[in-house]
Amino acid sequence: MNPSAPSYPMASLYVGDLHPDVTEAMLYEKFSPAGPILSIRVCRDMITRRSLGYAYVNFQQPADAERALDTMNFDVIKGKPVRIMWSQRDPSLRKSGVGNIFIKNLDKSIDNKALYDTFSAFGNILSCKVVCDENGSKGYGFVHFETQEAAERAIEKMNGMLLNDRKVFVGRFKSRKEREAELGARAKEFTNVYIKNFGEDMDDERLKDLFGKFGPALSVKVMTDESGKSKGFGFVSFERHEDAQKAVDEMNGKELNGKQIYVGRAQKKVERQTELKRKFEQMKQDRITRYQGVNLYVKNLDDGIDDERLRKEFSPFGTITSAKVMMEGGRSKGFGFVCFSSPEEATKAVTEMNGRIVATKPLYVALAQRKEERQAHLTNQYMQRMASVRAVPNPVINPYQPAPPSGYFMAAIPQTQNRAAYYPPSQIAQLRPSPRWTAQGARPHPFQNMPGAIRPAAPRPPFSTMRPASSQVPRVMSTQRVANTSTQTMGPRPAAAAAAATPAVRTVPQYKYAAGVRNPQQHLNAQPQVTMQQPAVHVQGQEPLTASMLASAPPQEQKQMLGERLFPLIQAMHPTLAGKITGMLLEIDNSELLHMLESPESLRSKVDEAVAVLQAHQAKEAAQKAVNSATGVPTV
């Protein structure tokens, strides 16, 4: 029996090296014969929900946990032997290094179980692991004993012994800080010198003559290829460190046969890689510090804006050190960077230029962020959204919406007949993972993201009331029921429903139109119209809307305020399509929507483009139905 059980009264086991597909149910089936289990948890990534390869099994009784550890360690689950040990809740026990030994030069055939069986004779083992990669064992491992005395006995007996005909090294585990300190101490007392860039005509004798004046050398070697030709580098090993140091000081950087040679301390590959990594990280940190607060990210650029135009637009705010529009295949990617000489200039540029219309589009300007910072910010947003989704009881899923992302369960309840589905605010983005319109204006099938889904038996609504899935912005109008059920019109939504249909977190706007719709060409007959900023947007029957009012409103109300002012204007142009068009236009950035409210011509242009997209889609759907009817393929 394992004598360490009394030290762990919580009876919690760590189970590692798990196959990614192992679930709590599989572990319960495996461990329940050992005794009653309180809980099992497979640890997973917070975002992807993929298994991290380890789990915790909590038994009711320590004796049951001890029995599982003794009888099930290294058992195979889904083709992989699992590694079981007592759960160490105190991190200081794991990180102190007491009782931990390091073994290297292991044969490839030695696995965790073989290492455990070999070293268990010296004392109770808390943890045992052979380090592996995708190709198998890397030839070294670790054994953590319960006591330091057991570790010392293992080192004394096993160091230098043969395991599977290979002489192994067994020693005390040393932290990276300790190893780096030892390497630094050895580096100061080096005797081996590395020389490179001396050409192809150098041989051992000439190299010895060149460096022999600094002191007696133990060995001199010029590295050659298979034909005996010099590779341009070699080594000289001196007897004393002082001689080696003198050779480096006097010969490094000198010219030899018209070439400047390099002379320095010979390093192992690992040392060189570590030093290069350290230098790279230092350069990266210096660059980040240098550009902190002065580098701006500019997006939503018009296709006609190049580096010079970008520099010209931002030059009034200070000295620009660089301005770059990112390109791909000779075409603008729609974003770029502007770097100023001081943080004050950059801050002023953000204040003045963010939201300003340049050419035909409003700019988004903000301080540039590193990839790690952006990912952390997006992860935080995602976790907040997920937390709010899970807090909403009994959400209702529209049967014509795509399925939620994989790994996310959401209960559905039946809807009352002729009632519109209710979407909690933060669920909208979760329920609509696919884009509303493709580049050709095609609507995705509502079941394309739901493998093996059963189509509902209810009659399919008319196209005028169906909404393809959207990943960002919900429809802002509620369905009005009228006497004629074959025709439904869109009307202004109630304030409560509007607030519920607005996402809690505003993400990057997604433009869902074709390229010609999104980026109007400059060579059209009409010149781009620049409308003077008005103090407020007036819509009959509603209070004036200003940019400051919109900015001060919570994110979940901003789209509602814009939608309530856009809908009556669009309804006057296209009464039957007002709801659809409003929902499409609300995916545009708020600053551009304000501009459209101020400029009737701009609004009409965008509405006409949206109508063209809808008509193209309807024509394509009608043609597809005709083809299916001709070929006898049933339509759904």
Swiss-Prot record:
Keyword tags: Acetylation, Cell projection, Cytoplasm, Host-virus interaction, Methylation, mRNA processing, mRNA splicing, Nonsense-mediated mRNA decay, Nucleus, Phosphoprotein, Repeat, RNA-binding, Spliceosome
Region ((Microbial infection) Binding to HRSV M2-1 protein): 541-636
Location of N-acetylmethionine modifications: 1
Any GO BP: negative regulation of nuclear-transcribed mRNA catabolic process, deadenylation-dependent decay
Modified residues (Phosphothreonine): 319
Gene Ontology terms: cellular component: catalytic step 2 spliceosome; cell leading edge; cytoplasm; cytoplasmic ribonucleoprotein granule; cytoplasmic stress granule; cytosol; extracellular exosome; focal adhesion
Subcellular location(s) of the protein: Cytoplasm; Cytoplasm, Stress granule; Nucleus; Cell projection, Lamellipodium
Modified residues (N6-methyllysine): 299
Tissue: Ubiquitous.
Major subcellular location class: cytoplasm
Location of Omega-N-methylated arginine modifications: 455, 460
One term of GO molecular function: translation activator activity
Modification(s) after translation: Phosphorylated by MAPKAPK2.
Residues with the Phosphoserine modification: 315
Signal peptide: none
UniProt modified residues of type N6-acetyllysine: 512
Misc. remarks from the entry: Many viruses shutoff host mRNA translational machinery by inhibiting cellular PABPC1 activity using different mechanisms. Picornaviruses, caliciviruses or lentiviruses encode proteases that cleave PABPC1 at several defined sites in the proline-rich linker region between RRMs and the C-terminal domain. Rotaviruses, gammherpesviruses and bunyamwera virus relocalize PABPC1 from the cytoplasm to the nucleus thus altering its function. Many of these viruses translate their mRNA in a PABPC1-independent manner and are unaffected by host PABPC1 inhibition.
Family affiliation: Belongs to the polyadenylate-binding protein type-1 family.
Quaternary organization: May form homodimers. Component of a multisubunit autoregulatory ribonucleoprotein complex (ARC), at least composed of IGF2BP1, PABPC1 and CSDE1. Directly interacts with IGF2BP1; the interaction is enhanced by SEPIN14P20 peptide RBPR. Part of a complex associated with the FOS mCRD domain and consisting of HNRPD, SYNCRIP, PAIP1 and CSDE1/UNR. Interacts with the PABPC1-interacting motif-1 (PAM1) and -2 (PAM2) of PAIP1 and PAIP2. Interacts with PAIP1 with a 1:1 stoichiometry and with PAIP2 with a 1:2 stoichiometry. The interaction with CSDE1 is direct and RNA-independent. (Microbial infection) Interacts (via C-terminus) with human cytomegalovirus/HHV-5 protein UL69.
Name of the protein in question: Polyadenylate-binding protein 1
Species of provenance: Homo sapiens (Human)
